[in-house]
Amino acid sequence: VAIEASNDDWSLAPFALAGQNAIVTGAGSGIGQATAKLLASVGAKVVVTDLVPDSARRVTEQIIAAGGEAIAVACDVSNESQVVEAFERADDWFGPLDVLVNVAAYRKKHETLTMSVEQWDIMHAVIGRGTYLCIRNAVPRMRDSGRGGSIVNVSSVAAERPVVFDSIDYDSAKAGVNAITRAAAAEFAQYGIRVNAVMPGATNRPGAPDLGGVRPTGPFTMPGRMPMKRIAEPIEQARAVLFLASPAASYISGVCIPVDGAGLLS
């Protein structure tokens, strides 16, 4: 499949997703929620999947209220049968799949020497296996449609430079996502399918302490350690996802882009 760009198109239209169909995993909160809303706002029909059914429904209702199109599907991405069912729901609702965004993850601090094998397996099942299962279900649909497609995985800067705030199971699972991204990009480029990753740095998220609108800025706080002296907001990660998912990035594949305010350089 050859997906070609036009040198005569100087508009911003390639940054939109009008007429495209997308699945976003882990879309019930945080980066996933911001991504689902943003993709819908630029014209995509979005399947909002999340482990928590109420979260998926809430985000879907917000998208519809804003004039977008979405359906909610509960899905544990580490469970093969649930992933298959989610993609079949998408088939029934919108037909050909154009965009897959793998955001679903699991994060819990574990000490290396006391972590159980079960805890290790859970982390890798959600992040590694979940990413693989979704790609395995997306690629045949994108290939067979003749339209190609775009897959964006949400990894982490921890895949490149682990920090004390993370743990070995999370860091290694995210490093695996980067490897999956590059391998899949090489394997599926022949079908017009692009595969990229966004590597968020520290990002405001559900469950973060309520600071009453005040962000700590001292040198020993997370924002204070960042070159930009703040952490990212979910929408800033979602905008990077949108760019990679959109036709504007039509010749970009196999890259893992840090969105961390120069954090990896500090």
Where are the regions that the model predicts?
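Short C-terminal tail/terminal secondary-structure segment
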Residues: A2-A13, R161, V241-L242, S253-S266
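Substrate-binding pocket helix/loop in short-chain dehydrogenase/reductase
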Residues: E111-T112, S116-H124, M222
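Alpha-helical segment proximal to the catalytic Tyr-Lys
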Residues: P140, A186-E187, S250
